[in-house]
Amino acid sequence: MPEVTLTTLNGLKAKGEKITMLTCYDATFAKAASEAGVEVLLVGDSLGMVLQGHDSTLPVSNDDMAYHTASVKRGNNGALILTDLPFMAHATPELAFTNAAQLMRAGAHMVKIEGAAWLAETIRLLAERGVPVCAHMGLTPQTVNVLGGYKVQGRQEAQARQMRADAIALEQAGAAMLLLECVPSELAAEITQAVGIPVIGIGAGSATDGQVLVLHDMLGLSLSGRVPKFVKNFMAGQPDIQSALAAYVEAVKTVSFPASEHGFSA
């Protein structure tokens, strides 16, 4: 696959072509996913749950993220590598820069930070210092204890209005991409239209500029046995993992995934 850059992703949004993203934590799957055409490999702090066996992402350290980012880099064949800043790694703007620098040195092309408009100062600092940022909004797993669980965000009009305003504010602060998780499909569509940067969805309907799933979820693997509504098992009916990855890419590109049953209403 030709090397994917931010320019590539912005071009896909401009053309109306969907962007494909999957989580990835090691060299073998990085090679498989990138060769299947997955454009963005997300080294997610979800590794705390699917690899380390924790019940949340909170125990994950920045050293963990750097280790797995370096592993993904070694197997990657052209995809853009996006790495999460884990819990409290961006407690202050300067701390965020220090931790982001570690991840960029490990091989990340961009970092992802969970939050809302209060992230503006941090995003501005990172962008000015050459670190592209993806802002993660909606259901933010690092704040699951504040949210009261893994719940859809933005169903109330006041919350939806604030989320739209926050998205615009973060773009103005320098965010290069947005990720919306567990947001009503209509709200996600409105935010996607309101900003000029690519918007990736997970449980956010089909109108976003692209889609992401946790690798283990889309392969039908689960420690808990609980399958989120927005997940589809792409291993079903496929002879091997490479075929499942290719099926995911095709489904996102042709907008056959996500279907209406994978989204949420207001």
Curated annotation (Swiss-Prot):
GO terms for molecular function: 3-methyl-2-oxobutanoate hydroxymethyltransferase activity; magnesium ion binding. Pathway: Cofactor biosynthesis; (R)-pantothenate biosynthesis; (R)-pantoate from 3-methyl-2-oxobutanoate: step 1/2. GO terms for biological process: pantothenate biosynthetic process. 3-methyl-2-oxobutanoate binds at D45, S46, D84, K112. It catalyses: 3-methyl-2-oxobutanoate + (6R)-5,10-methylene-5,6,7,8-tetrahydrofolate + H2O = 2-dehydropantoate + (6S)-5,6,7,8-tetrahydrofolate. GO terms for cellular component: cytoplasm. Mg(2+) binds at D45, D84, E114. It is found in: Cytoplasm. The active site is at E181 (proton acceptor). Signal peptide: none annotated. SUPFAM superfamilies: Phosphoenolpyruvate/pyruvate domain (SSF51621). Its EC number is 2.1.2.11. Keywords: Cytoplasm, Magnesium, Metal-binding, Pantothenate biosynthesis, Transferase. Catalyzes the reversible reaction in which hydroxymethyl group from 5,10-methylenetetrahydrofolate is transferred onto alpha-ketoisovalerate to form ketopantoate. HAMAP family: PanB. Homodecamer; pentamer of dimers. This is 3-methyl-2-oxobutanoate hydroxymethyltransferase 2. The lineage of its organism: Bacteria, Pseudomonadati, Pseudomonadota, Gammaproteobacteria, Pseudomonadales. The gene is panB2.
